[in-house]
């Protein structure tokens, strides 16, 4: 089975795609072509984790807001020019899988042009521009939240399946860092804001253990002076890190909230103010409404406020892990739809 996949720029778009592809690979023999942004995280991660995937690197930039900015003309032209390269690969595929980010749009557009069925998966409460545009032609649309349905055109809502966010997991993986620690995550590229805030927290909080993914080796060195903090620049086997944690402090990106809900971990979500369309804030508020987390906005974030919320979170019960990974539901549905 030949698949053309796209989704990247950040881990929030990449990892859901990879988790679905990994589940599909358990059910069928796959031949995967993955369309990457030249400077996206997928261009670095996929050669390490899935060297068997054929990578096609495309030099694109996302549209600036508002969309009518003159600089977007050049960007739209590049997107259009990339379609001929994409078409050469998609001619060979059985179907497409897109998980958002602007690389998804030209890939989905070419699938439509060549009459290849394709599926989209949306991780955030408010869908991105690429997925909204592709929804009209998609065979099936997978979303993480019930609320997301209302943001899509009424004409496509009969194609939407609410599954939750797909998660990568290895059941036989041992816990990496022991157990009963607070997991601190700044997203796939790290967060200077969270790093700076937590450095101040570590100066006064010595009773709790922390595992902190910093995004850079410089921050690992800087935080190494704290005995109760295990700092790493990046956590490659995330499932092992989640299994030993008792709570999480993190941004509200799609990968994080998917794993948080899957592993039943309570936490503090600090939405990134710079996220497109405030999607992290909407994600965080939805999780808080579900009673699974507390939201801490950047403008309210102080050491005392964070610690107060952290001790509240530690009183919340850790829920049992989900019985079925949404990635499995999505993979099975795709195969059913293709029959």
From Swiss-Prot:
Any GO BP: cell division
Origin organism lineage: Bacteria, Thermotogati, Thermotogota, Thermotogae, Thermotogales
Q: Which InterPro entries does this one have?
A: GlcNAc_MurG (IPR006009), Glyco_trans_28_C (IPR007235), GlycoTrans_28_N (IPR004276)
Report the HAMAP family cross-referenced here. MurG
Q: What cellular component GO annotations does this protein have?
A: plasma membrane
**What positions does the entry give for UDP-N-acetyl-alpha-D-glucosamine binding?**
10-12, 124, 168, 188, 235, 280
Question: Of which family is this protein a member?
Answer: Belongs to the glycosyltransferase 28 family. MurG subfamily.
According to its UniProt entry, what is the function of this protein? Cell wall formation. Catalyzes the transfer of a GlcNAc subunit on undecaprenyl-pyrophosphoryl-MurNAc-pentapeptide (lipid intermediate I) to form undecaprenyl-pyrophosphoryl-MurNAc-(pentapeptide)GlcNAc (lipid intermediate II).
Task: Tell me where it resides.
Answer: Cell inner membrane
Q: In which pathway does it act?
A: Cell wall biogenesis; peptidoglycan biosynthesis
Q: What is its main location?
A: membrane
In the record, what terms sit under GO molecular function?
Answer: UDP-N-acetyl-D-glucosamine:N-acetylmuramoyl-L-alanyl-D-glutamyl-meso-2,6-diaminopimelyl-D-alanyl-D-alanine-diphosphoundecaprenol 4-beta-N-acetylglucosaminlytransferase activity; undecaprenyldiphospho-muramoylpentapeptide beta-N-acetylglucosaminyltransferase activity
How does this protein sit in the membrane? Answer: Peripheral membrane protein
* Segments passing through the bilayer: none
Q: What is its EC number?
A: 2.4.1.227
Q: What is the organism field in this record?
A: Pseudothermotoga lettingae (strain ATCC BAA-301 / DSM 14385 / NBRC 107922 / TMO) (Thermotoga lettingae)
Q: Could you identify this protein by its name? A: UDP-N-acetylglucosamine--N-acetylmuramyl-(pentapeptide) pyrophosphoryl-undecaprenol N-acetylglucosamine transferase
């Amino acid at each position: 089975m030949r698949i053309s996949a796209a989704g990247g720029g950040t881990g929030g778009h990449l990892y859901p795609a990879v988790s679905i592809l990994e589940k599909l690979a358990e059910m069928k023999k796959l031949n995967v072509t993955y369309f990457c942004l030249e400077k996206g995280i997928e261009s670095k991660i996929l050669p390490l984790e899935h060297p068997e995937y054929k990578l096609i690197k495309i030099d694109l930039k996302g549209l600036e807001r508002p969309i009518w900015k003159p600089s977007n003309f050049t960007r739209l032209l590049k997107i259009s020019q990339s379609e001929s390269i994409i078409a050469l690969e998609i001619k060979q595929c059985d179907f497409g899988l897109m998980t958002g980010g602007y690389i998804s749009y030209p890939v989905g557009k070419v699938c439509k042009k060549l009459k290849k069925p394709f599926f989209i998966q949306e991780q955030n409460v408010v869908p991105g521009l690429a997925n909204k545009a592709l929804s009209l032609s998609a065979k099936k649309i997978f979303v993480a939240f019930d609320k997301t349905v209302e943001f899509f055109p009424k004409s496509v809502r009969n194609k939407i399946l609410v599954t939750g966010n797909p998660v990568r997991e290895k059941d036989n993986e041992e816990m990496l860092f022991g157990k009963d620690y607070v997991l601190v995550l700044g997203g796939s590229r790290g967060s200077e804001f969270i790093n700076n805030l937590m450095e101040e927290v570590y100066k006064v909080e010595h009773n709790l253990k922390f595992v902190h993914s910093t995004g850079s080796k410089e921050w690992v060195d800087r935080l190494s002076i704290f005995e109760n903090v295990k700092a790493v620049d990046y956590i490659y086997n995330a499932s092992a890190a989640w299994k030993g944690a008792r709570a999480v402090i993190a941004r509200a990106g799609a990968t994080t909230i998917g794993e948080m809900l899957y592993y039943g971990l309570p936490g503090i979500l600090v939405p990134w103010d710079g996220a497109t369309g405030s999607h992290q804030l909407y994600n965080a508020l939805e999780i808080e409404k579900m009673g699974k987390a507390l939201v801490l906005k950047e403008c309210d974030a102080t050491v005392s406020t964070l610690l107060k919320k952290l001790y509240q979170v530690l009183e919340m019960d850790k829920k049992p892990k989900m019985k079925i990974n949404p990635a499995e539901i999505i993979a099975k549905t795709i195969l059913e739809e293709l029959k």
